[in-house]
């Protein structure tokens, strides 16, 4: 199993470095305090960078950390120093794109907390026990939709439903303005 792409953890932190959704897949951080110390250190090292348009990568304590910021959420994927950073970047890209779609392009702390169940479903579809399962955002969304995202409709039906909901919101605003 050494050749299977794997990750050590996936972190979603807010703009203050506080946990929104985290999942660890290795025993490199055996206690809650060591996990929180790692999160704090990674956040401190990356917060002054501008990883808003593309993912950035940093070597941190013999780990590759690939990260990206979307609005007030910071996404991190950590892998060992032997891991391929392009695979880590594709994990981050697929996961963050799936979250962006699920939260309807409103990727911020409040929306993430309100939809924490969907975020953890995405995590489960991307990585299982540290082994990378899926990196394509559409495939992740299809699998999550099979778990009950907006009923049991297909992704196309969900897009249509989302478009109709947005149109209703705009129509209601125009009537009451």
Swiss-Prot record:
Superkingdom assignment: Eukaryota
Cellular component terms (Gene Ontology): COPI vesicle coat; Golgi membrane
Family affiliation: Belongs to the adaptor complexes small subunit family.
Membrane-spanning ranges: none
Intrachain disulfide bonds: none
UniProt topology in membrane: Peripheral membrane protein
Keyword Lyase: no
GO biological process: intra-Golgi vesicle-mediated transport; intracellular protein transport; retrograde vesicle-mediated transport, Golgi to endoplasmic reticulum
CDD domains: Zeta-COP
Function according to Swiss-Prot or TrEMBL: The coatomer is a cytosolic protein complex that binds to dilysine motifs and reversibly associates with Golgi non-clathrin-coated vesicles, which further mediate biosynthetic protein transport from the ER, via the Golgi up to the trans Golgi network. Coatomer complex is required for budding from Golgi membranes, and is essential for the retrograde Golgi-to-ER transport of dilysine-tagged proteins. The zeta subunit may be involved in regulating the coat assembly and, hence, the rate of biosynthetic protein transport due to its association-dissociation properties with the coatomer complex.
Lineage: Eukaryota, Viridiplantae, Streptophyta, Embryophyta, Tracheophyta
UniProt-annotated location(s): Cytoplasm; Golgi apparatus membrane; Cytoplasmic vesicle, COPI-coated vesicle membrane
UniProt main location, coarse: cytoplasm
Protein name, UniProt field: Coatomer subunit zeta-3
Pfam entry (one): Clat_adaptor_s
Oligomer status and interactors: Oligomeric complex that consists of at least the alpha, beta, beta', gamma, delta, epsilon and zeta subunits.
Keyword field: Cytoplasm, Cytoplasmic vesicle, ER-Golgi transport, Golgi apparatus, Membrane, Protein transport, Transport
Species whose genome carries this gene: Oryza sativa subsp. japonica
């Amino acid at each position: 199993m050494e050749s299977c792409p794997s990750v050590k953890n996936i972190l979603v932190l807010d703009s203050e470095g506080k946990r929104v959704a985290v999942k660890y897949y290795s025993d490199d951080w055996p206690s809650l305090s060591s996990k929180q110390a790692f999160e704090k250190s990674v956040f401190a090292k990356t917060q002054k960078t501008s990883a808003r348009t593309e993912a950035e990568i940093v070597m941190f304590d013999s780990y590759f950390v690939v990260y990206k910021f979307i609005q007030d959420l910071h996404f991190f994927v950590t892998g060992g120093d032997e891991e391929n950073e392009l695979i880590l970047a594709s994990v981050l890209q697929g996961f963050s794109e799936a979250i962006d779609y699920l939260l309807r392009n409103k990727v911020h702390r409040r929306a993430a907390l309100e939809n924490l169940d969907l975020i953890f479903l995405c995590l489960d579809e991307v990585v299982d026990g540290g082994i990378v399962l899926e990196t394509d955002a559409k495939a992740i969304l299809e699998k999550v939709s099979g778990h009950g995202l907006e009923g049991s409709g297909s992704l196309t039906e969900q897009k249509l439903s989302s478009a109709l909901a947005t149109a209703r919101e705009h129509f209601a605003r125009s009537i009451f303005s």
